[in-house]
């Protein structure tokens, strides 16, 4: 059976028809068709049919309708954007940063976060340094001044931070 389909293929390539192959090898026409499909038989085909090639571009000769128009959409056109979520709500700088992040590996990003956290802890140490228990920091939050003909009055809201409060803020930022 294996040799039959090889011999039948050779005859098929020479141009024999299914019916003639079936009679010669003593099998049905459908068996010949299944061999053709199963083993991928193909005959050499003649010259391809030539198709006319469209060479002219644009309108009729002398037509000035689209003179100077190169076609296509304007620059920075967003017609091809699927939904535009990011470009609609995020500024271009943020989008550029996101594109650069895509190039970095997750391990590099984790290492950067560790370094940033460590730097923040060291900076907080310097800011939150307490020299003694009684130290107080006073900040002027609001300042209001009233100038009249008689005198000048200044009023301000002063906020004081005690040592224990600063230490609490410091420990909260480290967690």
UniProtKB/Swiss-Prot annotation:
InterPro entries found in the cross-reference section: Homeodomain-like_sf, XtmA-like_N
Pfam families on file: Phage_terminase (PF10668)
Biased composition (Basic and acidic residues): 43-53
Region (Disordered): 43-77
Lineage: superkingdom: Bacteria
Gene3D superfamilies in alphabetical order: Homeodomain-like
Name assigned to this protein: Uncharacterized protein YjcR
Gene: yjcR
């Amino acid at each position: 059976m294996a040799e039959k389909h090889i011999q039948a293929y050779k005859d098929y390539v020479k141009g024999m028809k299914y019916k003639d192959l079936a009679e010669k090898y003593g099998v049905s026409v459908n068996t010949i068709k299944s061999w053709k499909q199963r083993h991928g038989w193909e005959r050499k085909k003649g010259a391809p049919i030539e198709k006319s090639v469209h060479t002219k571009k644009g309108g009729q000769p002398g037509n000035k309708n689209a003179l100077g128009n190169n076609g296509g959409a304007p620059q920075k056109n967003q017609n091809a954007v699927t939904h535009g979520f990011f470009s609609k709500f995020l500024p271009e700088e943020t989008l550029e940063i996101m594109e650069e992040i895509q190039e970095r590996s997750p391990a590099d990003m984790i290492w950067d976060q560790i370094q940033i956290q460590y730097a923040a802890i060291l900076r907080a140490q310097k800011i939150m340094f307490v020299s003694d228990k009684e130290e107080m920091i006073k900040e002027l939050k609001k300042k209001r001044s009233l100038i009249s003909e008689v005198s000048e009055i200044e009023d301000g809201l002063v906020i004081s931070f005690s040592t224990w409060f600063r230490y609490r803020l410091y420990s909260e930022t480290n967690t």
